[in-house]
Amino acid sequence: TMKKVDVILGLQWGDEGKGKVVDVLTPRYEVVARFQGGPNAGHTLEFNGEKYVLRSIPSGIFQGGKTNIIGNGVVIDAILFREEAEALAASGHDLTRQLCISKKAHLILPTHRILDAAYEAAKGSAKIGTTGKGIGPTYTDKVSRNGMRVGDLLSPDFERIYAAAKARHEKILKSLDYQYDIAELEKQWFEAVEYLRRFHIIDSEYFVNDCLAQDKSILAEGAQGTLLDVDFGSYPFVTSSNTVCAGVCTGLGVAPNRIGEVYGIFKAYCTRVGSGPFPTELFDETGERLCDIGHEFGAVTGRRRRCGWLDMVALKYSIMINGVTQLIMMKSDVMNDFDTIKVATAYEIGGRTTSEFPYEIDGELKPVYTEFEGWKCDLRKYGRYEEFPEAFKRYVEFIERQTGVPVKIISVGPDRGETITR
């Protein structure tokens, strides 16, 4: 049989807990690859009692002897990359041998960060809540064919290409009448670019396909979540890349028929960062409880996340678009003390009920809930699925019946060991 690339994806609005799961899954793989996104999303991993937030570096970095790839669909901020790599090096993880970067990955320039802030300021109250890292403007340049790529670092024309891009950006900033000072940022960026040149800068599409030909196992890890996908998410409150499974093909150069298992991660409830529609959002004390017990604050930004009940309409939509083969449920333990737990199984829009994710989500939409009795106990004391309380198993099996996909991994606590595999 042909080796295939397995994929792990968030099925909600990001922050599903991918860091921990990738940690549980990576031992099975020889190669771990990132295929989209930039340093806006942080994966929090605990390793030997230390906490690390990885933003652009794949999570396979903690397991020695693995190859980690930053694919062509990723955008890289040299400054943040250097900070991240140096912090890892200080704790004994030498990346220069373990990490390869695609020549075709795009670079976030200092002026991209400033453009991000300028565009957001110009929007006033219509902000989409960007993380201000320059990711949107970098993808804009990529699509309008003005971008700079990692491979340009190896070109004798590098300085000229940079100067042209910078001049273009300065023109835009002038028209937006935005005041800024770039000297310090630019100095850091040029130093960081020198640092980036030490790494293996490769034709990653050949590399990935060579690995498959050599029967190596590969895991592609997504950042963010399906409902933030530029095509299928709640546009315009989305990210600038394709976060769905198809993004693996375009972001790594893997053919669609070489995609294997698709692991879909979801939280037992829902959260969303920043602005944008969120049908099951709770504005009451229950929402506060989910946030506090679940420690729902951003890994990179520290922003408080909006919380709500599990949205089955959205989950089924994500499963369909990604072709999910196995589900992974995170943070079940957050609801250990709840008397009643709800799941949205349909939406009511203007007097009619639908189980489809609509083109537009507005204030008219009301979720239709199915109620469950809480399990009211600490799930960590059980070692096997069979031992779980009936109430919890009813919740899990309801999700399986509704989606038609098995829930294979259940996380019952923050620790790596607090994971039940079926």
Please report, for each region that a protein language model flagged, where it lies by residue.
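Non-transmembrane, aqueous-exposed alpha-helical and coiled segments at domain scale
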Residues: 2-422
